[in-house]
Amino acid sequence: MARARRVKRDSVTHIYQTCKQAGTCPSDVVNKVEQTTVADNILKYGSAGVFFGGLGIGTGRGTGGATGYVPLGEGPGVRVGGTPTVVRPSLVPEAIGPVDILPIDTIAPVEPTASSLVPLTESSGADLLPGEVETIAEIHPIPEGPTIDSPVVTTTTGSSAVLEVAPEPVPPTRVRIARTQYHNPSFQILTESTPAQGESSLADHILVTSGSGGQRIGGDITDEIELTEFPSRYTFEIEEPTPPRKSSTPLQTVASAVRRRGFSLTNRRLVQQVAVDNPLFLSQPSKMVRFSFDNPAFEEEVTNIFEQDVNSFEEPPDRDFLDIKQLGRPQYSTTPAGYIRVSRLGTRGTIRTRSGAQIGSQVHFYRDLSSINTEDPIELQLLGQHSGDATIVQGPVESTFIDMDIAENPLSETIDASSNDLLLDETVEDFSGSQLVIGNRRSTTSYTVPRFETTRSSSYYVQDTDGYYVAYPESRDTIDIIYPTPELPVVVIHTHDNSGDFYLHPSLRRRKRKRKYL
């Protein structure tokens, strides 16, 4: 069994002050404060018959009483043939008598006609200033600087003398240039250039070095400062998932907490539990009680009261809402399984008395929607990630250009139609409508495209998902057709066409009633 902790009692003086008026003071407290203990009585009554005044007890004089002090470790000592000498400390005699009387000078009366100004020379006050104090001042001469020889020019002519004074030399000025660069994570440096003197990098900082060697200023490095590593722009932090929430609106008031604690909708002994599967229970629950029209401007977020005539009886759209006279506002909560529950408390008017009072049970209509789970962390992918290697392409070295005037039309000149110069291919190759396919493996996939005979120009596109595509914009100019006249030849050549080809005029084509081609 553990012993009880001992509580320290209050001081005797404080206990006596508080309990004296009530008369409940303990006897030991009263005896100690009023000095009526056994020891106090012995000293009080014993001092009347015994006198200890000559011993010096409690006098504070330090004389040791009538016998004096005895050194430690020695006896009192006995001297043969004489009286022992008592060793006493020396005391300063205190003179007892009247205090010395100091004479006070009498002050002569001041005449009314005398001046109130007292000259300083007539002041009889004591000199409060100290006497003469010897002051020693040490004078240090200023060191002489370097002498500058200035040439002096003297003339003996009658004109004014001109003295040429050389300017003082200006001391060299020390200049210190500092540069500070701040890291901007939203700006990324991408350097691509031709190989030249220096080095380039794709990191956050660019260091360009040239020349041979350098010079260190400040001597050897004696102190090393520990640097803090800043996170790179490719690193990111993954936040921990938030704890599971109990409701979508966690704000709770005191009134709602008291109401929930006093009355529970899930009490099956007092409230009937009805699960509703109709989606109208969330938006327009009144349509489940009676037939009504739609009002898009009205939101049923309040308590609905339904009045019904006694003589008339209407079947509700939903049998679960039979005889409902009042349907409360929606309440949101969570179930033990973690689902969101929308609840409405309804009151039935099953029995009606002659006085007009309706009696009915209370019904709890509810519907479970979904659960509120914790957010799973989403792993983000890096956009624009590269290996750090730069590709440098020098166009003038790897390409060949031919100086050719494309705007010049070779057919615009007067050239003989039978000349062999027309057979030369002097046109510029145009690959604007072509497609470049580069495969990444040796075995390529072959596609068989059926070919149909038709007069129309057909275009086929084959999609290869294993390669790379290079697409260029395509632009075509529509040229107006010039119809021939009797003065024009059968073959019409347009000088605006740079391709150098020709086509047959539509009027010279064969006319057939049935179409052979699609």
Swiss-Prot record:
Entries under InterPro entries matching the protein: Late_L2
Cell compartment(s), UniProt: Virion; Host nucleus; Host early endosome; Host Golgi apparatus
Disulfide bonds: 19-25
Record note on modification: Highly phosphorylated.
Keyword terms, alphabetized: Capsid protein, Cytoplasmic inwards viral transport, Disulfide bond, DNA-binding, Host endosome, Host Golgi apparatus, Host nucleus, Host-virus interaction, Late protein, Microtubular inwards viral transport, Phosphoprotein, Viral penetration into host nucleus, Virion, Virus entry into host cell
GO process annotations (BP): microtubule-dependent intracellular transport of viral material towards nucleus; symbiont entry into host cell; viral penetration into host nucleus
GO molecular function: DNA binding; structural molecule activity
One CC-aspect GO term: host cell Golgi apparatus
Motif (Nuclear localization signal): 1-10, 510-517
One matching Pfam family: Late_protein_L2
Family: Belongs to the papillomaviridae L2 protein family.
Protein role: Minor protein of the capsid that localizes along the inner surface of the virion, within the central cavities beneath the L1 pentamers. Plays a role in capsid stabilization through interaction with the major capsid protein L1. Once the virion enters the host cell, L2 escorts the genomic DNA into the nucleus by promoting escape from the endosomal compartments and traffic through the host Golgi network.
Quaternary structure and interacting proteins, as annotated: Interacts with major capsid protein L1. Interacts with E2; this interaction inhibits E2 transcriptional activity but not the DNA replication function E2. Interacts with host GADD45GIP1. Interacts with host HSPA8; this interaction is required for L2 nuclear translocation. Interacts with host importins KPNB2 and KPNB3. Forms a complex with importin alpha2-beta1 heterodimers via interaction with the importin alpha2 adapter. Interacts with host DYNLT1; this interaction is essential for virus intracellular transport during entry.
Name of this protein: Minor capsid protein L2
Organism (species): Human papillomavirus 47
GN (gene name): L2
